[in-house]
């Protein structure tokens, strides 16, 4: 598999995570580290197109994950990315959100480095594991909804955005259930032509 656009240099992992408002695309979830600000803008673009093409979110709200909401807060690379993003007309950039807002659904697309995103993802997985160890499976409608929503194995895998085909990343600790779900997810992505739609959008915007 190759990149959909020569201008889109570093395909990120677009991971769908549950929130209080529905679903959010987090990008990058671990494919890259030490990204520069223009690469984070690419991530925002790819995540926005993915949210639109696959989740059906019109004009998705895009936010940077940061240690504060203020424009001048956080690492220099995040501050630079902020300045770049607020001047991109075709991205609905709403600014920074803090870690406590992630699961509350403060945005439709959450942009961060692959290093940070992978930590966030595994914290969410750890939350589910801890809950399951403390309370087990709760056989009620609410308990079943909780398991269905938060069991990371149900996601199966996450899509590499910006390729000219379907590339799925599965978890290193995936069991049979997770691999089964990953195969189903790959089928859904491929049959819906997600990679092609993303590629067409990216090529037109870059």
Which residues are covered by each model-predicted region?
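Glycine-rich phosphate/nucleotide-binding loop
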Residues: 1-27, 105-206
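Short, glycine-rich nucleotide/cofactor-binding loops
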Residues: 31-41, 169-176
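Glycine-rich phosphate/diphosphate-binding loop of Rossmann-like nucleotide-binding domains
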Residues: 33-99, 108
């Amino acid at each position: 598999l190759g990149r959909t656009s020569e201008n889109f240099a570093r395909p990120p992992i677009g991971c769908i995570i549950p929130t209080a408002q529905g679903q959010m695309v987090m990008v990058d979830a671990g494919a890259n580290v030490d990204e520069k600000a223009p690469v984070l803008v690419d991530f925002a673009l790819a995540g926005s197109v993915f949210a639109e093409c696959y989740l059906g979110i019109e004009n998705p709200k895009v936010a940077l994950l940061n240690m504060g909401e203020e424009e001048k807060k956080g690492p220099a690379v995040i501050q630079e990315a902020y300045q770049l993003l607020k001047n991109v007309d075709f991205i609905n950039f709403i600014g920074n959100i803090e870690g406590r807002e992630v699961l509350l659904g403060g945005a439709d697309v959450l942009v961060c480095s692959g290093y940070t995103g992978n930590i966030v993802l595994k914290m969410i997985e750890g939350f589910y594991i801890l809950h399951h160890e403390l309370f087990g499976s709760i056989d009620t409608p609410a308990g079943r909804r909780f398991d269905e929503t938060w069991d990371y194995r149900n996601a199966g895998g996450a899509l590499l955005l910006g390729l000219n085909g379907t590339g799925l990343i599965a978890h290193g600790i995936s069991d049979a259930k997770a691999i089964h779900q990953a195969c189903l997810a790959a089928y859904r992505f491929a049959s819906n032509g997600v990679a092609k739609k993303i590629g067409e959008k990216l090529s037109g915007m870059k």
